[in-house]
């Protein structure tokens, strides 16, 4: 027996079957670094213009987590795909370095020493801490295969950035949008600082619940409510914050609600009629009598008395009073609530909030001096009981604001702060108009979400009572407390920040005399004793001005950015602050499109939590599977929802990755001897090869459209389907015989090889943004004669992706053939199951087709026998089909007969032939194989 295996053109490539990603990826990272693959990518693009994805800066604190990995990989996919499409898309990574988390870490490290250290010394420690984690995170992001200007990031603590932030504050001042006033704001007693809306999280919290009556001794009660004795009249409120009762200044009722006077014993109590039943149940009053009804508007101006202080609490009107819970009469403390504050301004009430920064009552607060607010809660209830004004007491679990950093409950507290005014210069309306008209929101529900947040948000509190951040550039009069913040002066100070080695440390290190303009006098009192403002800017203002510090300043960027991409929580964070900062100073949004992704959750959809023990770290996945599998995970899911990750999910992706890799390996193996000179033009290719290229080209178009529309799960599924269904299960399966058995330089084989090369180059381009490591590895194994002369797969010019597509008629004919092939497989199956045949090559198939189908099959111009992978195939008229022919339910125009092929199996190609041994030198070969070996045929 001859060894004919050596005469076959078997696949040949050094591209390894086993990925070994954990070992090979670091090698590829070093290669990219050495070759400046990122620079090469950017230099090769630009034919289609520019594209700016502006990076939302992660916080420089701790190692990266799965949310970071998801975010950075998504951005990397976009940047790489845009460059490969011909857009010059550079990526400038950023870091957010100021703020409370770092300051608290440093505070913990320093302990008591911090109290005696100058501000600039503490700030130096904060800077060192941020630099440490910036470097750690940079290494971790690069390990993910993310391309970017890693040696030239933007950093919010760099002098140029701090100067830009201070300059933007000056721009707000110039337009009148920066104001200083006393208002209730979120306050964290633990961190001892004001908080922005974006720094508040809502968690369930159990609070005391009390119904309290306010004596209504006003003589006018008898006029408004005849028959009601003022000496025994009360108005009833309900609150879950008893500690705010010492600061009560009024009771609010709704002007359009009906209220009732309920007699119980000898006393009269006013509550809303719509809440009467709930109140009676809470008070546990079995016996009562409704003695009067009155509209809320008629109660305005009556003077109630505070339940335990000798001072009035007038009845006022407010539209925010509801009938959802309580009594319909609302305890009003203007120093502790936003709506209360607005009501207080309208009625001239005292904005009273006698608390220290740590949440203790001042000494002036009778009964509760020195107590924290939470210590005071039971004491206030005790006092109410003592004076006889507590009607009911209980506990309630409700959603309550907590500090994002320390996770402790926060309070509303009126303090003097700096604000960006939402109504000045029409900031709110301009922002709402921009949200509707100028920005594309992906997903579309993002528009409504941020619109609602902007529409109802209060003025933006931008001051923080901390040290690590950009100082609010202002002077305070020591004689009267008035603030001075001339816009030109503020911008001049900002320029000094830019020139100072450590930026805005200038504010802390420079003598007051060098900062205060000569001869400056207070515009309010005429005094000339000044001090520097010690408050710093909200870090959301810091990061929100990145468009001014980066997008407008870096030559590789351009304002406005094409895309901001972050997690869905950033509608209240970076998207929000950036929009207000840009609209407030430029009148336009800083972005054209905003894309949001969901949160990473475990395989059961649960939020990741250390206490639950379900946290998955990116490094764990990289160490086990490689970053490539993590990248594939990002591309495989619809990231606009919450994204699940588990070992089971990753194992499925490992299998999918293996199929894609094996397809690439097979393609590489079969083009090893192809050269540009031996390639076949598209028009001259075998029709099957043209169809395969059409399939790949259409997949390529769908993939490129998916990249453009940010639908990366479609990229993955299209690529995977191309490999598994169109190639492995169809085209490559058919092609093996032609590739292996044909003469090496035959037209049939060269046509197939050309198609495989074209398909591979399309695939490599389509894979590269997602499977970056593998695409580069595959590209490196493309035969040198065929490989484009570029240093990296990412430097392929956009013009190198021609489309090889068929016309609609030709495509329809091939799709019909696929349907016939599928039906024929069904017809063969009974013989395979019975053991009569082992493989489709053991069969002789006859297709009985109506005239239209027969013409379609015969008109394809390709070897039908090869496409059906049988040893013999005939096409006959449907009318000639025997009665026992297999009938297709899907194609009524088709019937099939299958029988065992006659003859013997060719030792070289395994096709069964009745004509073996036509050449005595090769008695076990079919005529085709004999012709190949003797050089007389293909």
From Swiss-Prot:
Catalytic activity: tRNA(Ile) + L-isoleucine + ATP = L-isoleucyl-tRNA(Ile) + AMP + diphosphate
Residues that coordinate or bind ATP: 610
Cofactor(s) listed: Zn(2+)
EC code: 6.1.1.5
Binding note for cofactor: Binds 1 zinc ion per subunit.
Sequence motif: 'HIGH' region, positions: 58-68
A GO molecular function held by the record: zinc ion binding
Positions of L-isoleucyl-5'-AMP binding: 566
Pfam families, per the entry: Anticodon_1, tRNA-synt_1, zf-FPG_IleRS
PANTHER family: ISOLEUCINE--TRNA LIGASE, MITOCHONDRIAL (PTHR42765:SF1), SOLEUCYL-TRNA SYNTHETASE (PTHR42765)
Quaternary data: Monomer.
Family: Belongs to the class-I aminoacyl-tRNA synthetase family. IleS type 1 subfamily.
Stated name of the protein: Isoleucine--tRNA ligase
Organism: Nitratidesulfovibrio vulgaris (strain ATCC 29579 / DSM 644 / CCUG 34227 / NCIMB 8303 / VKM B-1760 / Hildenborough) (Desulfovibrio vulgaris)
Lineage: Bacteria, Pseudomonadati, Thermodesulfobacteriota, Desulfovibrionia, Desulfovibrionales
